[in-house]
Design a protein with these regions (language model features):
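Hydrophobic transmembrane alpha-helical segments in integral membrane proteins
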Residues: 1-14
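N-terminal signal-anchor/start-transfer transmembrane helix
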Residues: 12-24
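Membrane-interfacial loop-to-transmembrane alpha-helix junctions, especially the N-terminal start
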Residues: 29-37, 83-84
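A generic, lipid-embedded transmembrane alpha helix
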Residues: 38-53
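Short, aromatic-rich membrane-interface segments at the entry and exit
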Residues: 56-61
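Alpha-helical transmembrane segments and their membrane-interface exit regions
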Residues: 64-73, 90-95
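Membrane-proximal helix-loop-helix units in multi-pass membrane proteins
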Residues: 82-138
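Conserved small/polar residues in nucleotide/adenosyl-binding loops
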Residues: 141-142
Length: 143
């Protein structure tokens, strides 16, 4: 149960990263409060999908891509093609940062790459470090 709450926290962090990325790079269609609410609501749906699919990586990747495309289309002035392109960039950065941190922990601690599924301490460490790295990567894509 505690791990579910941490995953919810991670999804909220990802919602804010998507909000920052799209609103920093495109003209806003929604006021900040509504835009943040839309992002959090969409990512909450992603969190529910994550619970239902038992953290299936491929389903989660597809869900996040769809969430980011929908969020971009409703919150900023962007074409569908650009929304898909930029959502794919966000997805790739998120996936790469998570995989990078999981690989480092797997190598250094001599644990399975998906040890976060069964070890709450590893989940917290990998989750926080990968999201900080994700935020940094997203922030530096458009200096």
């Amino acid at each position: 149960m505690v791990s579910h709450l941490f995953f919810l926290f991670i999804y909220i962090v990802e919602a804010f990263i998507a909000y920052m990325y799209f609103t920093d790079n495109y003209e806003k269609k929604l006021k900040a409060g509504f835009s943040i609410l839309a992002s959090c609501a969409l990512y909450f749906i992603g969190f529910i999908v994550n619970l239902v699919d038992n953290n299936n990586v491929l389903i989660n990747l597809a869900t996040i891509l769809i969430i980011n495309v929908v969020y971009a289309l409703i919150s900023v002035d962007i074409t569908f093609k650009s929304a898909v392109f930029h959502s794919s960039i966000l997805l790739a950065l998120m996936f790469l940062t998570e995989t990078f941190i999981q690989s480092i922990f797997s190598f250094t601690l001599k644990v399975q790459i998906d040890a976060y599924r069964n070890d709450f301490t590893i989940l917290i460490i990998v989750g926080i470090i990968s999201k900080v790295l994700y935020l940094m990567a997203v922030s530096y894509t458009h200096l």
